Curated annotation (Swiss-Prot):
Known partners and oligomeric status: Heterodimer of LeuC and LeuD.
Species classification: Bacteria, Pseudomonadati, Pseudomonadota, Gammaproteobacteria, Enterobacterales
Role description: Catalyzes the isomerization between 2-isopropylmalate and 3-isopropylmalate, via the formation of 2-isopropylmaleate.
Similarity remark: Belongs to the LeuD family. LeuD type 1 subfamily.
SUPFAM superfamilies recorded: LeuD/IlvD-like (SSF52016)
The protein's name: 3-isopropylmalate dehydratase small subunit
Top-rank EC class of the record's enzyme: lyase
Catalytic activity, EC: 4.2.1.33
Pathway as given in its UniProt record: Amino-acid biosynthesis; L-leucine biosynthesis; L-leucine from 3-methyl-2-oxobutanoate: step 2/4
Molecular function as annotated in GO: 3-isopropylmalate dehydratase activity
GO cellular component, one term: 3-isopropylmalate dehydratase complex
Gene Ontology biological-process entries: L-leucine biosynthetic process
Domain of life: Bacteria
Amino acid sequence: MAEKFIKHTGLVVPLDAANVDTDAIIPKQFLQKVTRTGFGAHLFNDWRFLDEKGQQPNPDFVLNFSQYQGASILLARENFGCGSSREHAPWALTDYGFKVVIAPSFADIFYGNSFNNQLLPVKLSDAEVDELFALVKANPGIHFDVDLEAQEVKAGEKTYRFTIDAFRRHCMMNGLDSIGLTLQHDDAIAAYEAKQPAFMR
């Protein structure tokens, strides 16, 4: 069973870029692993580092700024997660420590993959995201409160409403991924299998 997501309060980092694709999130040369761990070290590798080995941090990239170390909420622009359908993108984001991504829109496959990996993608309007960027840039180190149950983001003095479809919301709040959903029907599956002829078992 995955970790339950009900509420999260976290430090916000502003990635002021639109159309951030999955190759930027986790470059293809790091996709050889078959487990979900270890990808955070290579998140935004070509932007975070000046060298190919990932040993020389780029001082101009926002994730390297001291005030954003330990950030768990990523604020981004439209069409986040576009490009190829690699599930490694949400793996890298969660392994780095992100719990929430806020943007005006997401690529469809990335959006679905995020829920499967307990990464909450929050859609707000362009105007609301503009407000949040201004707020974060004026208050480096600010924390947002994200409440999935109430479907609200509290930022500064304002509250922003978002909508998640009921099924995905239920799964995240109960820590259910695809395997967890299947295991809810373990008894029924076992009963069905027991009725099968021996040659089919």
